[in-house]
Amino acid sequence: AFAGILSDADIAAGLQSCQAADSFSCKTFFAKSGLHSKSKDQLTKVFGVIDRDKSGYIEEDELKKFLQNFDGKARDLTDKETAEFLKEGDTDGDGKIGVEEFVVLVTKG
């Protein structure tokens, strides 16, 4: 799904950083996987993969499954991790992350 954007090694490095429950940090994942240095167009494509229901937003249930977009065998995020991820990315307080919010979240480092 991320061909031409992330290599398998980049994805593995990102997943390696958050194997234990409650160890996920979106900033760490974005940095380790190299997502933080991608273009807005590339990040918009990544957003489209994570937005599984194609609503134009990443909702809480999609955040919980975030890691599985990168590896189908990856774990669900815990409720705590999901809530922190949402809080980091949802700058307008509507309870979901839009594409602009996602691009800012990934690139702000």
UniProtKB/Swiss-Prot annotation:
Signal peptide: none annotated. It comes from the Eukaryota. Belongs to the parvalbumin family. CDD domains: EFh_parvalbumin_beta. This is Parvalbumin beta. It holds the Pfam family EF-hand_7. Transmembrane segments: none annotated. In muscle, parvalbumin is thought to be involved in relaxation after contraction. It binds two calcium ions. Ca(2+) 2 binds at residues 90, 92, 94, 96, 101. Residues 38-73, 77-109 form the EF-hand domain.
